[in-house]
Amino acid sequence: MAWLQPTLCRKELESRQTSGLDAAMKAAGKKYFGTALTVRNDAGETNVLNTKGEFGSITPENAMKWEAIQPNRGQFNWGPADQHANAATQRGMELRCHTLVWHSQLPSWVANGNWNNQTLQQVMKDHINAVMGRYKGKCTHWDVVNEALNEDGTYRDSVFYRVIGEAFIPIAFRMVLAADPTTKLYYNDYNLEYGGAKTAGAIRITKLIQSYGLRIDGVGLQAHMTSESTPTQSTVTPSRANLASVLNSFTKLNVDVAYTELDIRMNTPANQQKLQANAAAYARMVGSCMDVKRCVGVTVWGISDKYSWVPGTFPGEGSALLWDDNFNKKPSYTSSLNTIRACWKCHRLLVSIS
């Protein structure tokens, strides 16, 4: 039996059908390259989504959030969520489901209800059981709890924390495990990529869940980044090595990691210099996942700049995704694909041949 050296390993991987992001990721030993999606009637978006090997996972952008699914107590709106589940099934893609317990996009009847510990837990359980029952066996991953932390690593003020305390987090994980033990369970948050107090807070949450004897399969780092200093974010995307170090701070706790909502914004309008800097930032993000064995995949938060949430939330900023408004691939697409194909750390994925 012979072992391929890194250069030969790259050739072996490139000889496979790695013309798309997901195909290249899988050839390099990862699970998926995915996208967030809002189902709509746009031929350009559909064409990209249907391109073989481009995406292997779909995350419903908004359709599975509490406000969308159960706007009034006991009244469920399954239509949009079902559309996304069907979109994944029809294309043979994984369905990365998002999200069950979150302070935002929460209907007022939950956020402003007169709850005590017992009654709010019952509301959580009823919602989780209904949603998990509907999509049992379809969701490969669930963001169980989303954005429970402030920037300084303390707990965010939410109805769940005010009424139940930090225990609402392991309680939610216990409920989800009981409803569907086959799905992968994640804690998901933003600004974890920098290795500061908020990262330490997410490590604390991971240990808290484990201290209850419960399973947490992974931590999702949302990765809403910038490729240059902007009015809303002065710190640009860190180095590849620093990003990998943060990922490893979680994997040391015996959990997987993933970039779950990746986009990298800039001050608009874009120009070639900014697009190249953006491409380099994407290479650092994707490359850091390639460098960490238990980084299972990358999800970008949308296909095209045409529908990105960024300009509406951060005026004067944008051009954050891999396709432009007209569904043309940007330099960031090429840099991401080339980074995956380069098969960094390939010597750890040695391919045996007879």
UniProtKB/Swiss-Prot annotation:
PROSITE patterns: GH10_2. It is found in: Secreted. Its main location: secreted. Transmembrane segments: none annotated. GO terms for molecular function: endo-1,4-beta-xylanase activity. Disulfide bonds join 289-295. Keywords: Carbohydrate metabolism, Disulfide bond, Glycoprotein, Glycosidase, Hydrolase, Polysaccharide degradation, Secreted, Signal, Virulence, Xylan degradation. GO terms for biological process: xylan catabolic process. Optimum pH is 6.0. It comes from Gibberella zeae (strain ATCC MYA-4620 / CBS 123657 / FGSC 9075 / NRRL 31084 / PH-1) (Wheat head blight fungus). Belongs to the glycosyl hydrolase 10 (cellulase F) family. GO terms for cellular component: extracellular region. The gene is XYL1. Pathway: Glycan degradation; xylan degradation. This is Endo-1,4-beta-xylanase 1.
